Structures are given as structure tokens and as C-alpha cells.
A protein has these predicted regions:
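Short, intrinsically disordered or compositionally biased N-terminal tails of bacterial proteins
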Residues: 1-17
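Amphipathic alpha-helical dimerization/coiled-coil segments
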Residues: 7-8, 97-123
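Accessory beta->alpha helical hairpin/"wing" motif in late/C-terminal subdomains of nucleic-acid enzymes
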Residues: 92-96
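N-terminal helix-turn-helix DNA-binding core of bacterial DNA-binding proteins
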Residues: 18-61
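A cross-family signal for key residues in well-ordered alpha-helices
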Residues: 29-32, 65, 101, 108
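Short beta-strand/turn micro-motifs at beta-sheet edges
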Residues: 16-20, 77-79
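Basic amphipathic alpha-helical segments that dock to polyanions
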Residues: 60-62, 66-70
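Beta-hairpin "wing" of winged helix-turn-helix
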Residues: 70-86, 91
């Protein structure tokens, strides 16, 4: 693993404890961006970092492969115009868009409930 990378931690030092919880949010981010247009691994790493996730290529690429195998993403190979390197571009499938829609509905419900309880209990 490259120096400075962890397995999907947030920005805190305790975050590796929450890997199993946060990986679902990372997948939702991936589906969201891949629904808007084609995305590739390095761009996703940088975009996720803007949201506080530090994810290594060794974690992201197997996640993308699994999402493709489960039918949430399609990929195609392309050449990076600047460097001429091959890269994989990902886009959501119909199943991925349905999954994203379901995730958004659940997130709205969850954030409403968590926000209510936090306000009510002073947490």
C-alpha cells in the first residue's frame, strides 16, 4: 500500500474503525458520479478526497470491479489523450441507477431520523 493511504478512512485518526460503515457511502458516491458521466479511478480518488475520504487504488479498483460484476457499473477502455495511457471509464447501468435511487431515498429517511434524534437529545 502506498504511503499516506488507508482503507477508506475519514479524516480522523480513528476512522479505520469505521471502514465497514463508510464503504457504503463511498459506493454511493461512485454511483452518483458515474450516473452523471463517465468516471475513472484517479478522478474518483481525488473527488472522494474532496469529501474527506482517503482511498488507495488498491481499495478502489477492487471495489469498482465488484460493482461492475454485480451489474451496477459498466466500463470501457479509453486512452488518456495527454499521456496516451489506457484507462477504464465507468458509467452506471440501469441497475446502478435504480440502486442509487433507492440509496437516495434511504439516505433522506436516515438523515431526517438522525437529525431529529440528534436535535432532540442534544447530541
Amino acid at each position: 500500500m502506498e504511503a499516506g493511504y488507508y482503507r477508506i478512512p475519514m479524516t480522523t485518526t480513528d476512522s479505520t474503525k469505521f471502514h465497514d460503515l463508510l464503504s457504503g457511502f463511498v459506493r454511493i458516491h461512485i454511483l452518483h458520479h458515474a450516473a452523471e458521466g463517465e468516471v475513472y479511478g484517479q478522478w474518483l480518488i481525488e473527488e472522494l478526497a474532496r469529501h474527506g475520504y482517503r482511498i488507495s487504488p488498491g481499495t478502489l479498483y477492487p471495489m469498482l470491479q465488484a460493482m461492475e460484476e454485480r451489474g451496477y457499473l459498466n466500463s470501457r477502455e479509453d486512452r488518456d489523450g495527454r499521456l496516451g495511457r489506457r484507462r477504464k471509464l465507468y458509467r452506471t447501468t440501469a441497475a446502478g441507477r435504480r440502486g442509487l435511487k433507492a440509496a437516495r431515498e434511504r439516505l433522506r429517511e436516515l438523515t431526517g431520523e438522525v437529525g431529529q434524534k440528534a436535535g432532540r437529545r442534544g447530541q
